[in-house]
Amino acid sequence: MILKRVTEALEAYKNGEMLIVMDDEDRENEGDLVLAGIFSTPEKINFMATHARGLICVSLTKDLAKKFELPPMVSVNDSNHETAFTVSIDAKEARTGISAFERHLTIELLCKDTTKPSDFVRPGHIFPLIAKDGGVLARTGHTEASVDLCKLAGLKPVSVICEIMKEDGSMARRGDKFLSDFALKHNLKTLYVSDLISYRLENESLLKMFCQEEREFLKHQTQCYTFLDHQQKNHYAFKFKGAKTHDLAPLVRFHPIKEDFDFLTTDAFEVFFKALEYLKHEGGYLIFMNTHSKENNVVKDFGIGALVLKNLGIKDFRLLSSCEDRQYKALSGFGLKLVETISL
């Protein structure tokens, strides 16, 4: 079923059709209208503005953002999902920049190889978003999903995305009859971010285990697994054996590092050692993610942690967390199930 949905969606995307992409209920829980940038027309942009009603944005890769000299909109991103907005832009030729034709003109420029940074003015009425390297396997957002769709379809990695809102101005949520009726009315295919995650996991890998060895860690004997990701960064998993080891749903603690084992300089020194005591007693996995995230932002890079768990053959797990309401997104796409959260 998932393969069929993704295959049909990719075929539609290649042919210039719009799709509805939905994320998990525990994330933004919304449906976005997405379109490959190279198929943008004034009519399609007008359709998004008229029927989807959300903010029209353009998702693209970090390399393209760099090429067009699009810096982050803010120096500190503290939005709920850390959506990577750049400065907004208009085509230099545009007058007001807001008409469907002029917004299309700006999008068209983002898709051309010959476009220069000077072809845009800032700020404007198109809002570029930078997709995270690794796509939905690194961050489970609409931004990454729409760029992944372009890459999988063999198209330039620029997508137009727009949130779908109801007529009363409220968000159309996953599970709403509104979204299914919207898809039926406009003959649009629907895809889930978790579908893309599953599809990519079946066809590629961002993470490979290259070392497994017995290693002493803070005076405790562990099994150490070392992984290499697509950016040539190392990530580590230490397996602890405890008196109450739960093999079916092991304890897991995710921890960010800035360099190899540079955990002592993180913001969570006390929490780290509290988690360590749990693992020594009950057994489980301590996973170091080389993501340069702060402790309170580790969820942003959960994709890497999920890939580590998948490589270790773990399906169900219990999470050691310093924040009970922290939400880990699109777990089903990784074949994972969080059965319990233990507060530190």
From Swiss-Prot:
Instruction: Kindly state which keywords UniProt assigns to this record, in alphabetical order.
Output: Lyase, Magnesium, Manganese, Metal-binding, Riboflavin biosynthesis
Give the first-level EC class, as a single word.
lyase
Q: Which InterPro entries match?
A: DHBP_synth_RibB-like_a/b_dom (IPR017945), DHBP_synthase_RibB (IPR000422), GTP_cyclohydro_II (IPR032677), RibA-like_sf (IPR036144)
Tell me the pathway: Cofactor biosynthesis; riboflavin biosynthesis; 2-hydroxy-3-oxobutyl phosphate from D-ribulose 5-phosphate: step 1/1
Q: Where does Mg(2+) 2 bind?
A: 28, 142
Example GO CC term: the record gives: cytosol
Reported EC number(s) for this entry are: 4.1.99.12
GO BP annotations listed = riboflavin biosynthetic process
Q: Where is this region: GTP cyclohydrolase II-like?
A: 203-344
Show which residues form the site (Essential for catalytic activity).
125, 163
| Signal peptide from the UniProt entry | none
**Named cofactor requirement(s):** Mg(2+); Mn(2+)
What is the UniProt remark on how the cofactor binds and its stoichiometry? Binds 2 divalent metal cations per subunit. Magnesium or manganese.
Residues of the region (DHBP synthase) are 1-202
Q: What are this entry's molecular-function GO terms?
A: 3,4-dihydroxy-2-butanone-4-phosphate synthase activity; GTP cyclohydrolase II activity; magnesium ion binding; manganese ion binding
So what does this thing catalyse?
D-ribulose 5-phosphate = (2S)-2-hydroxy-3-oxobutyl phosphate + formate + H(+)
User: Where, in this chain's numbering, is Mg(2+) 1 bound?
Assistant: 28
Family the entry assigns: In the N-terminal section; belongs to the DHBP synthase family. In the C-terminal section; belongs to the GTP cyclohydrolase II family.
What job does the chain carry out? Catalyzes the conversion of D-ribulose 5-phosphate to formate and 3,4-dihydroxy-2-butanone 4-phosphate.
Which PANTHER family does the protein's record reference?
A: 3,4-DIHYDROXY-2-BUTANONE 4-PHOSPHATE SYNTHASE, GTP CYCLOHYDROLASE II-RELATED
This chain belongs to the protein called: 3,4-dihydroxy-2-butanone 4-phosphate synthase
Q: Gene encoding it?
A: ribB
